[in-house]
Amino acid sequence: MAFYNPHAAGELAARAYLLTFGQLSDVVAQEARRPVGNDLVLEGAVDGRWAAPSHVYETLLHLGEREGLPMFTITSLQNVEPTPPSAAYLRTMLDGLGEAFGWTADERVRYLLRAPGVAPAWTASRLGQLCNGQYRS
């Protein structure tokens, strides 16, 4: 699980999906393990932040606009101690970075090694093996 920290230094590679308000409401509900089908209530915003009905992702955050459309993410703004991600999670991240941005295996590995919690549990060599489908746990 990864969280977006709007106060962190550096750049963040991200992928966006065009959703209706109802679809966004359903994603938030699913992450909170609540029934879908009810639109979010976006009242009481503080600096573009709303409380989300989840114990993990407790904040719906307005990120700005792109091409005139609002961008949102759900995240946790709590101080969370980073832990090493699983091989399956990292493989998904590595594949997504290549697919979305066309990054080489080396670029993807270098990017993930800068992410909190990845190193020292994961080395460039092991991430490279994951990238190339050669990793064996």
PLM regions and their residue ranges:
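Glycine-aromatic micro-motifs
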Residues: 1-137
